[in-house]
Design a protein with these regions (language model features):
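Active-site pocket-lining/capping segments in soluble small-molecule metabolic enzymes
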Residues: 1-67, 85-89, 94-186, 193-207
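As written
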Residues: 80-81
């Protein structure tokens, strides 16, 4: 806050019952008492509980909620969410329609970073491949690794085509005016597993 920045607390993961009952509120309260601006959530139960204990706290619906249209976003608005982070898979036309249908809800959309080959947080590959659950916010990004692809006993890809599961990264700079015109309120730049220098530089380019 002293640097003129807003503080958003990430609770955008699926929580177990014992975590919700015994840890959630005590975890959030110190941040709230120091002026926390918003909490980013995935779990609907978590969202409702936060609104109960901190009724004036802004709630941002995480991309982990997989909101791909207006109906779900309207429900989230009715439940008290002020902002929705859209799925990366949404088109500009769909985002514009969301803005039209939910004009009071802030829309945040990804503009730069990795593209998951699944819907965000709807993947078990990291659990199987790296022992870390993407559904619990600990994705090891095994889809970004190099793989050999076989058809029966014959390898069918070479070293120049070894990233079989890695989607091309997103860079929305060329269409930034269109994104803003569609009604996007906040631009989201992926920071997971990135260092501060990278995040600062990319942010400065978009600013």
């Amino acid at each position: 806050h002293r640097a003129g920045c807003r503080i958003y607390l990430t609770v955008n993961t699926l929580l177990k019952h014992k975590e919700i009952e015994g840890q959630l509120i005590s975890y959030i309260r110190p941040f709230y008492e120091h002026g926390l601006d918003a909490v980013i959530v995935q779990d609907l139960g978590v969202m409702r509980l936060i609104k109960k204990h901190f009724p004036d706290m802004d709630i941002h619906a995480s991309t982990q909620m997989t909101q791909t249209g207006s109906l779900g976003s309207k429900l989230l608005w009715d439940m008290g969410a002020e902002r929705v982070v859209t799925s990366r898979e949404m088109t500009l036309t769909e985002i514009a329609q969301l803005h039209k249908d939910c004009p009071d809800m802030e829309i945040e959309s990804f503009v730069h970073g990795a593209m998951c080959y699944c819907y965000s947080g709807q993947c078990l590959m990291s659990s199987f491949r790296g022992g870390r659950s993407g559904n619990r916010g600990r994705c090891a990004q095994p889809c970004r690794l190099s793989y050999k692809v076989y058809d029966n006993d014959s390898q069918i890809n070479d070293k120049d085509n070894s990233f079989a599961l890695s989607s091309k990264d997103m860079c929305a700079l060329p269409i930034l005016p269109d994104i803003i015109e569609a009604g996007v309120y906040s631009l989201k730049i992926e920071g997971r597993m990135k260092n501060v220098t990278y995040a600062a530089y990319v942010t400065s380019v978009y600013r």
